[in-house]
């Protein structure tokens, strides 16, 4: 999957993110420079994806609701390697597409909560997809915590990269 647009847009995203949100980033060295990994982050806002792209040198192929690829930004999302997920019915295409990316020793980005709700503090229940993907592809999972609120021109957002781990048993 060629993601030429990702290489073009990442510096713009990074500059925007660091200027506007002034994040604190911890332990980004936990992301290996190569090899298949799944970045699994909590989901607090649409800017979570921007945060991960801006604070990470690897190209991340996010799983995202298919509605995002239908709007005006859809062509850009497609060019960045977004994998669409049909959440209205059991999606039979997203997991094989993600596994193919991992077979190429690339990076999948997933939000195990599946969505976010602005009116809820804390985590929503996790879905099993990230663990199943890690098990089936023998990939490592890197947990990421996005802590705080995305408030323009104020400090307050922290991105913490956890240590990679592997799912060892069935």
Predicted regions and their residues:
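A cross-family acyltransferase "interaction/gating" segment
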Residues: 118-170
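Helix-adjacent hinge/juxtasegments
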Residues: 80-109
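Catalytic core of membrane glycerolipid acyltransferases/transacylases, capturing the structured
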Residues: 5, 18, 33-89
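Short, basic, glycine/proline-bearing loop/turn elements
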Residues: 12-13, 79-85, 113-118
């Amino acid at each position: 999957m060629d993601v030429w647009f990702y290489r073009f847009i990442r510096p713009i995203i990074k500059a925007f993110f660091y200027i506007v949100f002034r994040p604190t980033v911890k332990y980004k060295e936990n992301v290996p420079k190569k090899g298949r990994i799944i970045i699994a982050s909590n989901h607090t806002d649409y800017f979570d994806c921007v945060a991960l792209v801006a604070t990470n040198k690897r190209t991340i192929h996010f799983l995202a609701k298919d509605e995002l690829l239908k709007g005006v930004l859809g062509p850009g999302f497609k060019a960045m390697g977004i994998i669409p997920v049909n959440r209205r019915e059991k999606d039979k295409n997203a997991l094989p597409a993600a596994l193919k990316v991992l077979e190429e020793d690339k990076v999948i980005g997933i939000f195990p909560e599946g969505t976010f709700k602005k009116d809820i503090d804390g985590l929503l229940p996790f879905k099993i997809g990230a663990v199943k993907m890690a098990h089936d592809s023998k990939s490592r999972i890197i947990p990421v915590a996005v802590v705080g609120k995305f408030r323009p021109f104020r400090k307050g957002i922290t991105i913490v990269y956890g240590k990679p781990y592997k799912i060892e048993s069935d």
